[in-house]
Swiss-Prot record:
It catalyses: UDP-N-acetyl-alpha-D-muramate + NADP(+) = UDP-N-acetyl-3-O-(1-carboxyvinyl)-alpha-D-glucosamine + NADPH + H(+). GO terms for cellular component: cytosol. This is UDP-N-acetylenolpyruvoylglucosamine reductase. Its main location: cytoplasm. Its EC number is 1.3.1.98. The gene is murB. Belongs to the MurB family. It is found in: Cytoplasm. It comes from Bartonella quintana (strain Toulouse) (Rochalimaea quintana). Its cofactor is FAD. Pathway: Cell wall biogenesis; peptidoglycan biosynthesis. It is an enzyme of class 1 (oxidoreductase).
Length: 321
């Protein structure tokens, strides 16, 4: 595995002459521990927060193609490795991409940086049902669109009418629900696409019923998930016909710990940073759990948490299976 030296100051100096018209914020050597909910990870070589969609499109058109681009959202379902992220990390801000606009009696135009709880609150205010499950999803809409995030038996795919995206060259795309090719925690859109917004649809509802559904979602999270810990949410996707937490528990991995990383005692499909975990600790724990579960029940767990960046040179976690 090739290791690239992180030098954001040098990269910024190299790119700045060509990026003079960019309005967004470019910052070198950003500590990703301040960005992710796990509070782990190395440096982002260059961190870009576009002012708006036009600014993002111009940036992508201008950025040389040999510079790698990594997209991050709110950071709730993200593990950044300790060696950092070479190239440019792009994070959409709520200021430029956090709108929730009701465009018809049943539809919202929603920016990709909108937090799930804000979308649920807007739907409550508009008395549109079908969005209450977002009250229990800690991330933003961009990640929900990419992962077909869901809770309480509803997935994002059930709400999508159209998705708006930019590709690596800054070209605009309008994607239908069929174009997204959704399946469980997956869409088949090219990895270099950046979702900027989506048109979502619900149904007219009753405010009291919607509020009750949101309260039920919140109570469930508080009761069974370690929401007050430094965690990335669900670690692994559910295997077919069984919950990931069950096969993890049956393999004896509840409470399993490596360094500062632990499988939660409260919900053993949640990894937590107990205080001083590194990205290495978390990923090593996850791969250990995958190996033990496979040895116990032949279920090969697939990561739900997104792992990005490079390992430190001397601390590489081999992937099981």
């Amino acid at each position: 595995m090739n290791f690239q030296l992180i030098d954001g100051e040098a990269l910024l100096a190299q790119l700045q002459p060509a990026l003079g018209d960019i309005k967004g914020k470019l910052t070198p050597n950003v500590d990703m521990r301040k960005v992710t909910w796990f509070r782990t990870g190395g440096l982002a070589e260059l961190f870009y927060q576009p002012a708006d969609e036009a600014d993002l499109a111009l940036f992508l058109k201008t950025l040389p193609e040999f510079i790698s681009v990594t997209i991050v959202g709110i950071g709730s379902n993200l593990l950044v490795r300790d060696g950092g992220i070479p190239g440019v990390v792009i994070r959409l801000s709520a200021k430029g991409f956090g709108q929730v606009q009701q465009v018809s009696p049943k539809r919202f135009l929603v920016g990709a940086a909108t937090a799930g709880k804000h979308l649920a609150a807007a739907a409550l205010e508009a008395e549109i049902t079908g969005f209450h499950f977002y009250h229990g999803i800690p991330g933003g809409l961009g990640g929900a669109l990419k992962m077909n995030a869901g809770a309480n038996g509803i997935e994002t795919a059930a709400r999508v009418v159209e998705v708006y995206a930019l590709d690596r060259k800054g070209r605009h795309h309008i994607l239908s629900l069929a174009d997204m090719h959704y399946s469980y925690r997956h869409c088949a859109i090219p990895k270099d696409f950046i979702f900027t917004a989506a048109l979502l649809e619900g149904e007219p509802g009753n405010r009291d019923d919607i509020r009750a559904a949101m309260d039920e979602v919140a109570l469930h999270r508080e009761t069974v998930q370690p929401v007050r810990e430094k965690t990335g949410g669900s670690t692994f996707r559910n295997p077919e016909n069984i919950s990931a937490w069950r096969v993890i528990d049956e393999a004896g991995c509840r409470g399993l710990q490596i360094g500062g990383a632990q499988m939660s005692e409260m919900h053993c499909n949640f990894m937590i940073n107990t205080g001083q975990a590194t990205g290495y600790d978390l990923e090593a724990l996850g791969e250990t759990v995958r190996a033990r579960v496979f040895a116990h029940s032949a279920h090969l767990l697939q990561w739900e948490i997104q792992r990005i960046g490079q390992f430190e040179q001397s601390r590489i976690v081999p992937s099981f299976g």
